[in-house]
Amino acid sequence: TNKDDFFEIKRHQNKTTVTAYRIKKGVKSDVFFKKTYSKLTTKEIWIYGLDDDDCFEVTGQGTDFIKVRLVGGQNKDTYNVQNGKKVVVYDFKTKENEFVTKRGLRKLTDNYETNVYDYKKLKYNSNLLIPSFGSNPDDGFKIGLININTKNHFERNPFSAQHKFSAFYYFATNGFDMSYTGEFANIIGQTNLHINSKFTSPNYAVNFFGFGNETPNLEIDNNEISLDYNRVKLRTILINPSIQWRGHLGSSVRFGVSYESIKIEKSLNRFIDSVVDDTKNLTNDFLGALIAYSYKNRDDNAFPTLGLETTIELGYKSNIKTSKSFSYLKPSVALDHKISSNGQLVLASKFLGHLNFGDNFEFYQAATVGANSGLRGYRNERFTGNNSFVQSTDFRINIRKLKTSLLPLDIGL
């Protein structure tokens, strides 16, 4: 409550009894809460003192206890922890508190979201499984699966942990790719650990037509040349750990390092044969570092009528074998704004850029423009160069919202 309270936590083997008293004239008096929790049905007990001066007393002998988290909240609180096993104390670092013993784990922080009770705080985990399929000339028919698993424990930023796994198979090349992104909250203070990894099979392909804006697409004018002519098979292994700071309004800053191994799979009678003719150049390993800033704020993820998303990434990569290195900058901005009062019609614009500094990069690290980067009507990676810039604008119409027993749907153009 927002008054002076005394919390008595008696711990027994496989069960814990919590009794809450009102403090009157400096001593505990009326009982306003009492309950015994069984370890068979309870994983953790969270006790919030809220405002005013509160006292927490933890007693009991044994080892197999329910984990207890004590959250003092505002004002001066007193903690008398006689048995600190599986006891965690949270309170404000800059406020005065009294600790009678040194037992238990203390986590003193001025993080408001941790120390203040929020009845909306989710107490369950979630798992989202998304099937994906599509078709285009470069990939052929493709099928895939995306799984997002979110853990919501006590300490969050904005969740305790999140795991994203995706896998796609491409029928045109018989290639596949897999990626994993993990984020773990508050590894050091309010800093998250971010892990990004990717693997592509030896048959996974990208396109390369040469450097410049006037490179020909011979497949259009010559029926004897297939789409395979400009395909390059790349086996990729990427590991990118980083630390991430998250802001309260949708911003984040990430700093990390990376290791990347890329192998070109030799294929006969393709354009790449004229570019890479030395078997020593087929495999390259890179070490890198990056710093990235992102901001995202939208009123709706499915059909935003008002939103802003921007990212900027500055990085450096060095070839381990040749010691050649280069740096790059990748900025992007996306804007969404409704142009009708009811939000059914939305104007959406996106700006993408890629700048490489120096010439010591491989062709698959160059800036590209194509169907997979906003240039509609062209093949993926249609144009390649040192730098690139793409701007696209959409008019979006939200025709109808449907609520079904399986999934909510937004139908639009």
Language model regions located:
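GD-rich hexapeptide-repeat beta-solenoids
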Residues: 2-25, 93-100
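Detector for repetitive beta-architecture
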Residues: 4-6, 44, 53-55, 65-67, ...
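Acidic/polar low-complexity surface segments
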Residues: 15-41
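Flexible, solvent-exposed coil segments and beta strand-coil junctions
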Residues: 25-28, 110, 121-128, 155-164, ...
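Outer-membrane beta-barrel initiation region
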Residues: 46-48, 58-60, 71, 78-208, ...
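Transmembrane beta-strands of outer-membrane beta-barrel proteins
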Residues: 132-134, 146, 162-168, 194-200, ...
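Transmembrane beta-barrel wall of Gram-negative outer-membrane proteins
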Residues: 176-197, 222-268
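C-terminal outer-membrane beta-barrel translocator/porin domains of Gram-negative envelope proteins
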Residues: 179, 208-209, 223-229, 278-282, ...
